[in-house]
Amino acid sequence: MTCKIIGCGGYLPSKIVSNDELAKFVETNDEWIRTRSGISQRHIADDNEYTSHLALKSAEQAIADARVSANDVDLIITCTTTSDNSFPSVATKLHGYLGLTNIPSFDLQAVCAGFVYGLQVADSLIASGKYKTILLIGAEKMTSLLDWNDRSTCVLFGDGAGSVILQRSSDDSGLIDSNIFSSGADYEILYTSGGISMNGTSGKIIMQGQKLFRHAIEKMQQSIEDLLHTNQFSVSGIDYFIPHQANIRIINKLAELLNIEEHKVVKTVEKHANCSAASIPLALSTLKASGKIKKGDILLFSAIGAGLTWGSALIRW
């Protein structure tokens, strides 16, 4: 018994900031950003537009795409590291926005790997038989964590949300398998300078870029190869590779090492920047909207985030 995706949705704030616009108040330029990240623009939420608002927009799209009612949802999981409030959770606020009754809702925090983590958790809960229809969301307002004087980080992130509706599969479609990992020893590679119990602030993003690049390649490659081997899949059997959209150099290097053909690699980082837990569901929503995915296609997700946390998932559409 496994879960399958029956609907997708994605939302990006209307405000777009290009590299050239960013260079007006950050010591950088378009060539420098593109060369190092592949990013040309990012979407930035307004001050009064919160993570829960982004989540709601994407959730409404996913519900419509799945052709179900919001009242059919019996569990909400929101993957985010940028909650509106310390409490309650974004998922619970979304529960209220959707006007739902007493179904459970909670947030899951695994940063950029959040959606892959959430997918495994949701699959386990559906397999338990307790839940039939789960709304799984990746939503982030990453720009709220940026130090706009640090050009090594502030140019890399954007805001957005992506959602999927999951139900139990009655055929061979759905989640084939997934794996998730963490390494707390690598905490200082990517973290924020603050937190509620530390200093009562959200802090700003601090990143050791070169170390993170090496770990991303090594850990995502190993995760993918282990997943394919365990499930007796070959790389040639993958129809679409949807990696976390952090950096075009990481995406391209992974595809090269894994020998995944260029036309199979989904890339949205140029226009979306790094939307953390939202990046994979946003990319999936973009791919589905293009009409390219067909029934039976094999999709491969993989992500790495702060913690470090990482993992991969195989899905038959």
Curated annotation (Swiss-Prot):
Q: Per the record, what are the reactions this protein catalyses?
A: malonyl-[ACP] + acetyl-CoA + H(+) = 3-oxobutanoyl-[ACP] + CO2 + CoA
Q: Which keywords describe this protein according to UniProt?
A: Acyltransferase, Cytoplasm, Fatty acid biosynthesis, Fatty acid metabolism, Lipid biosynthesis, Lipid metabolism, Multifunctional enzyme, Transferase
Tell me if Acyltransferase is a UniProt keyword of this record: yes
Q: Which residues form the active site?
A: C112, H244, N274
First-listed, main subcellular location of the protein, grouped into a coarse class: cytoplasm
Gene3D superfamilies per UniProt: 3.40.47.10
Instruction: Read off the Pfam families from this record.
Output: ACP_syn_III, ACP_syn_III_C
Pathway, per UniProt?
Lipid metabolism; fatty acid biosynthesis
The Swiss-Prot or TrEMBL record annotates one GO molecular function as: beta-ketoacyl-acyl-carrier-protein synthase III activity
Q: A biological process (GO) annotation for this entry?
A: fatty acid biosynthetic process
**Family annotation (InterPro entries):** ACP_syn_III_C, ACP_syn_III_N, FabH, Thiolase-like
Where is the segment annotated ACP-binding? 245-249
EC number(s): the record gives 2.3.1.180
Record GO cellular component, one term:
cytoplasm
Q: Which family does it belong to?
A: Belongs to the thiolase-like superfamily. FabH family.
Protein purpose: Catalyzes the condensation reaction of fatty acid synthesis by the addition to an acyl acceptor of two carbons from malonyl-ACP. Catalyzes the first condensation reaction which initiates fatty acid synthesis and may therefore play a role in governing the total rate of fatty acid production. Possesses both acetoacetyl-ACP synthase and acetyl transacylase activities. Its substrate specificity determines the biosynthesis of branched-chain and/or straight-chain of fatty acids.
Subunit structure, interactors included: Homodimer.
Domain notes per entry: The last Arg residue of the ACP-binding site is essential for the weak association between ACP/AcpP and FabH.
What name goes with this protein? Beta-ketoacyl-[acyl-carrier-protein] synthase III
- What is the species listed in this Swiss-Prot or TrEMBL entry? Rickettsia akari (strain Hartford)
